[in-house]
Amino acid sequence: KNDKYFTYAQELKEEPLVVNSQTSFQPMYSPDGKEVAFLENRTTLRVINLKNKQVRTVLDGKYNYSYADGDQYYQWSPDSKWFLAKYIAIGGWNNTDIVLVKADGSGEMTNLTESGYSDNNAKWVLDGKAMIWSSDRAGYRSHGSWGAEDDIYIMFFDGEAYDKFRLTKEEQALLDEEKEDKDKDEKDKDSKKDKDKDDDKKDEKADKPVEPLKFDLANRKDRIMRLTVNSSFLGDAVLTQKGDKLYYCAAFENGYDLWEHNFKENTTKLLIKGVGGGTMFPDKKGENIFLVSGGQLKKIEIKDSKTKPIAFKAEFSYRPAKEREYIFHHTWRQVLDKFYDPKIHGINWAGYGKAYEKFLPHINNNYDFAEMLSEMLGELNGSHTGARYRSASSAPATASLGAFYDNNYTGDGLKIEEIIAKGPLTKADTKIKPGCIIEKIDGTNIKSGEDYYPLLSGKAGKQVLLSVYDPATKERFEEQVKPI
């Protein structure tokens, strides 16, 4: 709590927010920070109040079907009182609608789209006075198989916002000019007042609570507009705060490109090729878009149409045996929750779980692990079951300190026998010399007989802290070096 940024926090404390026997994931804070929404049993939308820890159901799980974890979608309203969510209504689970549901748990909901096509990824825009979403109602589709092209649409919940959105460039310019004149008059009046009172007024304005949203749903179907000029295989989309431009990722040729549609100029242009599909987040000023794609972060500068990678480092302790153990239990539990029927072929799923779990300690690679999982899932005698694995990418290279060690030394640490010329340990000001014992690498003790190579994994070219003992002088000291 004392750190300014979570990213650079020196100490992290984790504790469970929701404790129950149900599968719970995909949390999202409310905009006012008072509550957290999450999915229970993959499809039930629930909310926990952070103050009293009471949990309520907002959208019953019967209104959705989860084919794979992560395929559900919902979003808080700006006033923290409503949700836009995925919803199975008249089109079946392959053609979902968008539902507006009240967050208080009353069950009040409205099917906003009612199209019979696939409507997805609804987002609040224009301060909650409208929503944008993707729909395949106008796109090409494969009638004999799967897949369809999408468009981005907008639906207005407020008549004034709808009228303002449709203003021409000239009409918008006149409106902006009137606003500038009005703001100038107010500024002149404020300048005549006491400065302290003016500051108090600004503080009061800054702390003004978000006004509850009001919806004119009766006229919503007359306030729907198609925003994209042609259907395509779409990624994410972002509407600017002013509502004058739409940025979206679309794939026409090789991969996803970033496009811009200017509503006042009625122009569509390609901004950046090959940005990749993913999720886009605009900054508060609307000057940049942050794209999360393929495990990478990118910053897109809208004005200059430039994209910059955002470098980050997130190290973790890789324990493949523990990872396989987790995946095994996750697989077994998911079958139990989503697929298993006690009457299916007389299968004892609990018994099979215990029987196949015994193989885990004897498996040391993912190829054999995938085979074992496939055999266990095969006991179900059901279609479309099995497991596969991806070949591991190149493991991080093990760095070298540029020294030979005494193989006859049996104590803790690494006793240096020879230092290689022009290596990491030959700095001009170093006190490390043959005969010294490296006791720790980055604070981790080197025990006798233990493999020290993992301590240098991926450390090439990075600062590494060595804790060294010199038996000749009885001195202990620390030095930073860059292994190669």
Regions found by a protein language model. Give the residues of each.
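Terminal targeting/pro-maturation regions of precursor/exported proteins
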Residues: 142, 306, 311-375, 379-380, ...
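Blade-terminus and WD-like Trp-Asp/Gly-His loop motifs, strongest in beta-propeller folds
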Residues: 27-35, 74-83, 122-130, 237-244, ...
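A short beta-strand motif characteristic of beta-propeller blades
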Residues: 13-18, 56-64, 109-112, 225-227, ...
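C-terminal, low-ordered peptide segments at domain boundaries
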Residues: 172, 305-323, 426-427, 447-484
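A short helix->beta-strand "capping" segment at the edge of beta-propeller domains
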Residues: 8-18, 213-231
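PDZ/PDZ-like domain segments forming the peptide/carboxylate-binding groove
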Residues: 396-449
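A flexible loop/linker signature enriched in serine peptidases of the S9 family
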Residues: 1-6, 18-24, 34-52, 60-69, ...
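Extended, small/polar residue-biased N-terminal targeting/export presequences
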Residues: 361-412, 475-479, 484
